[in-house]
């Protein structure tokens, strides 16, 4: 009998442990930073993939019901920041200046043509805190591997438990 009560309690309590959906609001998507540890002189392929990933993330956020704000009013400040994903909260200050509820930033770490790490941060501007953060390692430096990596990161880590767009 005690086993059945414990099992029933665990089943009813399980939803409390699940991630809650992120409340929808306005997002300042401030970009992705490419950290190329391989030291390639020509990183034009990666720059094109950063642009592709930026578009993919923006489309995903919009499809999930977030409203992306225009970041052009802070473009000059943004251009002076080396790594927007790691700037001691400057992304949240910029997002606040834009009137956004959240900031979204990311970082790509290229170790070699085979090994890359994708990081994405969703931060609550009012709370001045990380709301969600995810990282995935991908194998292969191709458009397809980057796209799959970000799709996995968004669907299974950042918005885990929420419907896929």
Residues covered by each model-derived region:
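N-terminal signal peptide c-region/cleavage motif recognized by signal peptidases
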Residues: 13-18
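Glycine- and acidic-residue-enriched helix-capping/strand-helix junction motifs
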Residues: 40-52
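Short, well-ordered secondary-structure micro-motifs
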Residues: 39-41, 81-82, 116
């Amino acid at each position: 009998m005690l086993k059945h009560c414990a099992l029933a309690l665990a089943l009813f309590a399980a939803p409390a442990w699940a991630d809650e959906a992120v409340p929808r609001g306005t997002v300042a998507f401030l970009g992705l930073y490419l950290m190329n540890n391989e030291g390639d002189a020509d990183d034009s392929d990666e720059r094109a993939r950063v642009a592709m990933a930026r578009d993919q993330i923006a489309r995903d956020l919009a499809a999930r019901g977030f409203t992306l704000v225009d970041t052009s009013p802070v473009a000059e400040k943004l251009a002076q920041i080396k790594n927007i994903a790691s700037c001691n909260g400057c992304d949240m200050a910029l997002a606040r200046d834009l009137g956004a509820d959240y900031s979204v930033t990311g970082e790509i770490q290229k170790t070699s043509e085979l090994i890359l790490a994708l990081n994405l941060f969703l931060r609550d501007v009012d709370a001045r805190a990380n709301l969600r953060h995810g990282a995935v390692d991908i194998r292969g430096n191709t458009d397809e591997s980057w796209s799959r990596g970000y799709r996995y990161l968004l669907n299974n880590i950042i918005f885990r438990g929420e419907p896929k767009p």
